[in-house]
């Protein structure tokens, strides 16, 4: 068994140092190329989307997700970089998006391969690289099926003041709308103002009972201690404020929704 382990792995007719037989030509190393190929410039890519993840493994880990570089098509490992929007290629040093652009933004790639980010509504953008400084015309933004801006959703509302129609989209539990025509505030529906009016009336009733009890209980002492009158005034002011607020909500104009809009 030991003799078998010491036996040479190559045949006797080959040189032990070079692994070549006597009749083979001597090995000549391949000369290193003088210049590497320059990556070609690409036309501007408007609204560039991130490439899909490749099921192949990266050189560092056989299970790490990778994507293809949008410039040189090299594989880029995104392990530990999922939270980023773009990653940098280690071959061409250019950025490649791995996530969609933030809301209201889009990716644009300059012909010099620089990845830019701008507003969706932008029509012109300049490359920041000192040797490029190219101005890219993106053209007018036409809303269509592929537009990242969603169409407005909401309801058409008839103003309770001027009876004109306007679009309102912010529907919450406290829905107050300002008409763009008459600039007056009204409530969308009757539920919210009725609820507020009822609360203010109940507070007003509580303050009325409290004020009446305070005045009746301190009537004689107030003639001796003048500071008690200040507490009377305070509670009377609370009664008036809650009463005014209750009347305000009770008399608020109501704007009725006409139909849903999408």
UniProtKB/Swiss-Prot annotation:
GO molecular function ontology, one term from the record: phosphatidylinositol-4,5-bisphosphate 4-phosphatase activity
Top-level division of the source organism's lineage: Eukaryota
Leader peptide range in chain numbering: none
Location of the region described as Disordered in the Swiss-Prot/TrEMBL record: 1-25
Matching Pfam families: Tmemb_55A (PF09788)
GO cellular component: late endosome membrane; lysosomal membrane; phagocytic vesicle membrane; plasma membrane
Motif stretch (CX5R motif): 118-124
TM region positions: 198-218, 227-247
Subcellular localization: Late endosome membrane; Lysosome membrane
Primary subcellular site in the record, as a coarse category: membrane
E.C. number: 3.1.3.78
Keywords attached to this entry: Endosome, Hydrolase, Lysosome, Membrane, Transmembrane, Transmembrane helix
Catalytic residue list: 118
Topology versus the membrane: Multi-pass membrane protein
GO biological process, one term: phosphatidylinositol dephosphorylation
Catalytic activity line of the entry: a 1,2-diacyl-sn-glycero-3-phospho-(1D-myo-inositol-4,5-bisphosphate) + H2O = a 1,2-diacyl-sn-glycero-3-phospho-(1D-myo-inositol-5-phosphate) + phosphate
Enzyme class of the recorded protein, top EC level: hydrolase
Role of this protein: Catalyzes the hydrolysis of the 4-position phosphate of phosphatidylinositol 4,5-bisphosphate.
Descriptive protein name: Type I phosphatidylinositol 4,5-bisphosphate 4-phosphatase-B
């Amino acid at each position: 068994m030991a003799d078998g382990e010491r036996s040479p792995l190559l045949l006797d007719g080959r040189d032990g140092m070079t692994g070549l037989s006597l009749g083979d030509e001597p090995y000549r190393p391949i000369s290193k190329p003088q210049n590497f190929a320059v990556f070609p410039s690409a036309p501007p890519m408007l609204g560039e989307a991130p490439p899909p993840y490749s099921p192949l493994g990266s050189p560092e880990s056989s299970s790490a997700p990778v994507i293809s570089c949008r410039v040189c098509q090299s594989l880029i490992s995104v392990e530990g970089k999922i939270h980023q929007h773009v990653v940098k290629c280690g071959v061409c040093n250019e950025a490649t998006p791995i996530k969609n652009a933030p809301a209201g933004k889009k990716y644009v790639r300059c012909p010099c391969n620089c990845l830019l980010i701008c507003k969706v509504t932008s029509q012109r953008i300049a490359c920041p690289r000192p040797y490029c400084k190219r101005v890219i015309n993106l053209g007018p933004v036409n809303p269509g099926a592929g537009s990242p801006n969603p169409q407005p959703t909401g309801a058409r509302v008839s103003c309770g003041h001027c009876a004109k129609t306007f679009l309102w989209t912010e529907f919450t539990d406290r829905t107050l709308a300002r008409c763009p025509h008459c600039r007056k505030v009204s409530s969308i529906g009757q539920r919210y103002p009725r609820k507020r009016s009822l609360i203010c009336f109940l507070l007003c009733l509580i303050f009325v009972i409290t004020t009446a009890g305070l005045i009746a209980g301190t009537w004689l002492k107030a003639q001796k201690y003048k500071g008690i009158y200040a507490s009377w005034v305070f509670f009377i002011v609370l009664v008036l404020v809650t009463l005014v607020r209750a009347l305000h909500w009770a008399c608020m104009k109501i704007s009725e929704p006409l139909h849903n809009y999408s």
